[in-house]
């Protein structure tokens, strides 16, 4: 089975979950004994302030408090910018809309996603999303909370500096930490070593990690993921006679999640009579459509990306190649024994079993063991929640004062 290498329990974090700082009360005082004046500190009333964990993904930004088992908020990573030509003179409405602000607006909007294949390309939009998270979604004062931010594999090092500039300069947070998404994912499995196979909405990675050290020189990347699978499903449905457009992608996304799966043996599925495959799906307007082989054919692009026009290898091939590169460094056996699936795209029904089968065929002598945690869709955020809760981690927060004194060196020395 794909899950024979069962994920470890998360365990109990040391210290107070998510405690990033405290605020003392004002009732400390002096007692005069007559013979001598002694400093007597009464027990201080302390308000614990939890750290905030933010995982900015290509489809959603997941956020919540450290110490929680799952994120509390899922904010769309797509923002809406008002078209300048549609604004009247003296119009004081917000120029950028985020989250629920995008609903029920009659103003023409240009939809923008600040990430392209997992890499930030529009920092102004990132700032708008974070502003919405702090002020509207979580309703907190950012200057009262430390923040842990995830960073994609192979992203430019300048990303971490930009995160710090925004968090400290714009939002005035007291402390922050930036760390690898892959490292956080492996923590969600209760491990520090393994081969993280991540596939979200905009990009896929295969990342070897040994004893908490990410190995970027051995990391693989593919510019296809869940969003491409959705587009391919729309192509297949249109070839079957439907007329979906990009305006219907949210509907296609829902069809993918509710109706589609990865076939263990696709050639056997192709041999089934149509009635065994067909399911009806009701569109928002009440119209019923019937979906047949498209249900499993769409997921084949993860194994054969050429079906969707990509020249990159499939996810199992990408993983096998990464395992091969681990041979020279002596990590191969450890990596093969701990192949960890992460990200929303891997949540497709049947994907773990099919991935295990394909990887075993590509690496017959390595006995790869694939693990698929039930909550792997939010593995990055969950790992961040665990990390920010550990007592041993508290010394790795970069304070605002440190950043002001040392600049980027403060970030690189702790993150």
UniProtKB/Swiss-Prot annotation:
Pfam families: Actin. The keyword Thylakoid does not apply. GO terms for cellular component: cytoplasm; cytoskeleton. The modification Phosphoserine is found at residue 6. SUPFAM superfamilies: Actin-like ATPase domain. Gene3D superfamilies: 3.30.420.40, Actin, Chain A, domain 4. InterPro entries: Actin, ATPase_NBD. Residues 1-35 are annotated as: Disordered. Belongs to the actin family. This is Actin-like protein 7B. It comes from Macaca fascicularis.
